[in-house]
């Protein structure tokens, strides 16, 4: 909300499109156009929204499971097409809404309900996926750093073309502490590198 207020685009010129998952209730809390779509299809629907109405500021919100598993193909092509679309990827490294299955960003060896002996796959790195699809803008922040998150969202909006903002979040129920190395202010100072 704060980033959008600082950007200054009126609500009637903004759309927030989401998929399914913990991230995806956001359109219901916004005083903008919005749609909570089906699993994995948020980037495709947001693309259609932007192409149909190019003057609309379109924000697409997905989680790591929604956006990179069933929606991975749409994520790739939204980056490749490079239309002026702002994609927010809320990454908690787990399927939290469906009660704790591993996601495309869960680390190798991660034990969950769907991987009782640990995952055998290496995780997707959203930045690599973005740039591999010829994306031009990628930024990452941690949800506990409100000022940093606001700054990357504003930078994404000001970028002309597709932008991806990965926001690292905690899931206190099924994956608590997953981003502790950067979530706490004192640790972030030691472990984070800020680039512009």
Task: Give the label of every model feature segment.
Residues 20-22, 92-94, 145, 168-173:
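Glycine-rich beta-alpha junction loops
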Residues 171-196:
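Flexible, low-complexity linker and terminal segments
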Residues 60-62, 137-142, 164:
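Short catalytic-loop micro-motif centered on adjacent basic/acidic residues
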Residues 55, 103-156:
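Conserved thiamine diphosphate
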Residues 2-9, 51-54, 80-84, 90-93, ...:
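Generic secondary-structure signature for well-ordered alpha-helical cores
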Residues 33-34, 78, 103-107, 156, ...:
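Short, hinge-like loop/turn segments at secondary-structure boundaries
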Residues 37, 43-47, 51-117:
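A generic, well-ordered mixed alpha/beta core segment in the N-terminal half of proteins
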Residues 1-59:
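Thiamine diphosphate
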